[in-house]
């Protein structure tokens, strides 16, 4: 959130303590020292009349109580995938598919390195061919912005395919 928000983002980042032992799996990230404990909020203007309000929340099951509220009115979602921990992302993808909310998958590249090729991730996670998969570095403003732009493009395309009778309304509201 901090890499792309044009306002000072509201964040709930906290130092990890002994209380997280046995709760958070740090096997793939043994040097991790902070974690999001609730949600983040930010804003990004893609155009003078197209403003995105950004909400980010951890993927762990214990945070799901807020997911239904966060997706109400959403145009779509980015499932940010740490390729070192693919198994952690299945439930997030299921969540958005069950709610018929357009989503894209963002493969978070740490230090410009992917652990798996895009097609390998698509196959391993059974992501439909029409769902975009982008590579990004969530710490980099331009990379994150391009991922959000791709989400907006996909969400508009997704909506128009399912609601062709409202195409004029969609372009008029932009």
Model segments located where?
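Short, glycine/charged-enriched secondary-structure capping and boundary segments
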Residues: 2, 68-70, 92-96, 118-122, ...
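Canonical P-loop GTPase G-domain recognition
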Residues: 111-168, 174
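Conserved NTP-handling cores and scaffolds of large molecular machines
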Residues: 4-11, 100, 155, 159
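Conserved C-terminal guanine-recognition region of P-loop GTPase G domains, centered on the G4
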Residues: 80-130
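Conserved G1/Walker A P-loop phosphate-binding module
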Residues: 1-29, 33-35, 42-53
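Residues at the C-termini of beta-strands that transition into short coil/loop
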Residues: 13, 58, 137
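Switch II of P-loop NTPase G domains
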Residues: 33-43, 47-95
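Conserved protein kinase catalytic core
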Residues: 8, 62, 88, 114-115, ...
């Amino acid at each position: 959130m901090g890499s792309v928000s044009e306002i000072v983002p509201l964040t709930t980042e906290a130092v990890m303590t002994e209380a997280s032992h046995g709760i958070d799996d740090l096997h793939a990230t043994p040097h991790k020292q902070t974690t999001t404990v609730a949600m983040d909020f930010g804003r990004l203007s893609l155009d003078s009349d197209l403003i995105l309000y950004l909400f980010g929340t951890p993927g762990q099951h214990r945070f799901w109580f807020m997911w239904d509220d966060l997706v109400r009115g959403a145009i779509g979602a980015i499932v940010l995938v740490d390729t070192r921990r693919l198994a952690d992302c299945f439930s997030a993808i299921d969540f958005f598919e069950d709610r018929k909310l357009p989503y894209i998958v963002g493969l978070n590249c740490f230090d410009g390195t992917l652990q798996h090729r895009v097609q390998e991730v698509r196959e391993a996670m059974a992501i439909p061919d029409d769902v975009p998969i982008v590579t990004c570095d969530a710490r980099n403003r331009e990379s994150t912005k391009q991922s959000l732009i791709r989400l907006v493009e996909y969400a508009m395309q997704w909506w128009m395919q399912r609601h062709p009778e409202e195409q004029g309304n969609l372009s008029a509201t932009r």
